[in-house]
Amino acid sequence: MSLCEGVVSLSALAGAAGLAIGSIDFGANVNGRLPFGSPVFGAVALAAVVGLPMAIACVADWRGARRANQLTMGAGGLLVGWIVVEVVVIRSFSWLQPAMAVIGAAVGFAGYRQWSLTWGATHDEVAGPMPGDEIRVPEAFSATRAVSIAAPPEEVWPWLCQVGVGRAGFYSYDSLDNGGVPSSREILTGFQQVAVGDLAAPMTFPPSPNTSFIVASFEFERALVWAKADGVWAWSLVPDGDGTRLVVRLRTGPDWHHAARSLIGGVLVEVGDFPMMRTMLLGIKERAENLDTQRSTSLQDARQAV
């Protein structure tokens, strides 16, 4: 991707230089529709809107900078926007514009996809091992995301144990993944026991092996791994000072024994997994932090009463 960004950046900067020195001339009609009616201002705009953002994204991508994906998204969007301005406002047309629009859209989407697959996670968390990595699945999709929670692991763990339809929900978009039933804001004591082989995170009620994961392994208050034939959903709770670093990794791919269902599922994962998983992580964060605050307040009240 950095190579593509570099080529686009150099092309845009070369075009800007050509406009500025007069070696590129669109004619009086088009020049009059450039910013301030001046090719020089047009050159400045082209360099500022396309050339420099693409160059910055290229360098950030090449160096593996933390915000490289966001910069790539922005640069791709600006390129598409520039092409729209050329066609609609400046009314300058060339065969390169469709190609540049496609490149801009592809660059922007690539940045978005990589950002969404690693949302909140550090480079070490993305590259490092996770519980459940040893389980082999047909892997076509892999996402590692994370969130910092101002509550200890023992106050985050219960919210994971009770995930699923007919239980606490998924703390996400309840109309989509929980039949419209609001996800619980309380710890449900009836769903706190975890054992290898149990059905986990059921997506229907009553739970069914076809619509649930199975608990593949767990380490109490530290790790929880759910698995099924075509995927692994793993959670890691890492102590982080007084809080928790909650890391989640989803690996999934086609189950050719159910090809049609896998195809539909693959499309849904690509489109819907990120917004729902992000909301789920933030939902767990909110609930665990609220519980921690309530317990701290109750403890302070009890101490004051004594």
Regions found by a protein language model. Give the residues of each.
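Topology signature of small-to-medium multi-pass alpha-helical membrane proteins
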Residues: 1-124
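Hydrophobic pocket/interface hotspot
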Residues: 13, 156-159, 215, 246-248, ...
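Intrinsic-disorder/low-complexity, polar/charged segments enriched in Ser/Thr/Lys/Arg/Asp/Glu/Gln
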Residues: 140-148, 223, 232, 243-245
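Alpha-helix-centered segments that form part of catalytic cores
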Residues: 192-215
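Short beta-strand segments that buttress and anchor functional surface loops
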Residues: 200-203, 223-230
